[in-house]
Amino acid sequence: MSLTLKHTLFALILTGSFYACKQEAKTEKIAEETGQVPGAGLLKSRYTIGDSLQIGFAGTVTDLQVNINGESASHSLKGTDSATVAFGMNKTGWHQLAVSGKAKGVAFADTLRFEMVSDIVPGEMKYTVISNFPHLPTSFTEGLEFHKGELYEGTGENGKSQLLKIDPKTGTALKSVNLDQQYFGEGITIVNDKIYQLTWQSGVCFRYNMDFTLDKTFTYYFQGWGLTHKDTTLMMSDGSNKIHFYNTEYEKTGDLEVYDQNGPVRNINELEYVNGYIYANIFESTKIIRIDAVTGKVVASMDMQGMVPANVDARRDVLNGIAYHPSEKLFYLTGKNWPLMFKVKINDQTTGSRVAKK
């Protein structure tokens, strides 16, 4: 992840943390200058899924209307200067709250933002190594995926990036194509017999035919990290806690913000969608998390430290390849410049436990 991106994310967190205080100060200033009470403020900006929102007003409020993300939300006034709002959604991340009504007979409308963290404490996934195979130690793995029983790999580094078709039992490349040296290859996925390959900082996604001839290129406006898909929806990570959704023509259709019970989970890298969940490795770690693909909640995690081969640079040559073989119901895992690929059975029944209510 770039330093600029880290600074941007940090600024967003600070903005959210102090939002309620800024809103209150703004309300007091307008009231002082105009003699009118203009609006509302959240008593805090971060909640846990299942919590109710607490809104404070500077005076008596009537005709209150509340919407969350454009949909009407049930609420109840507490006295004349505060209200409780039910959050009926089950999705983590930042949400928009629109409040309108009358305060001291003066109409007002405010738009506020709040953050929802997961109500799940992630469980611990267990894994069993079934076997291992050779893997090209020259491959700086960035993406790994099975398609119709055949294994494909995307690799990175400028001047070394490739798309490959791999014999998993021998580790040899059956077919390959090189990216131009200006491109640092990243994650791959295959939809409708088209191979998509991201680039890191170039903002370009290549789409290939199955014979590795170039079909089309697309552009995006942030870093490209991991890539997977559900049906015809592409799912892309950018190194933050966000997963972006696109259709097969790379038109944005939505996104998902990934959270555990403590807050956003960043450095999401390589992705693999399996049966309603996204498996993702956390950059510069040996950790794999399982994400609910609808809500954004991290429901389980596991540490693969015991699988890292000896004599690799543990800081540079990190875990970074996750492929699921649907007929075997097994995962194939490897890393950047690893000499081995592992066939692994993961306990996929772990779903975590509910956060205890205070």
Per-range role (PLM):
Residues E153-N158, Q197-S202, M236-N241, A280-E284, ...:
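Conserved beta-strand positions in repeat-built beta-propeller and related beta-rich domains
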Residues P137-K148, Q181-V191, Y220-T232, G263-G276, ...:
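Beta-rich, blade/repeat-based domains predominating
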Residues C21-A25:
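Bacterial signal peptide processing site
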Residues V117-T138, P168-L174:
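A short helix->beta-strand "capping" segment at the edge of beta-propeller domains
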Residues F57-D63, W200:
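Short proline/glycine-enriched turn/loop motifs at strand-loop junctions of beta-rich domains
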Residues F87-W94:
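Surface-exposed, short loops/turns at beta-strand junctions within beta-sandwich domains
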Residues T128-P134, T172-N178, F212-F218, G254-G263, ...:
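A short beta-strand motif characteristic of beta-propeller blades
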Residues I166-G171, N209-T213, N247-E251, D292-G296, ...:
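Short loop/turn segments that connect beta-strands within beta-propeller blades
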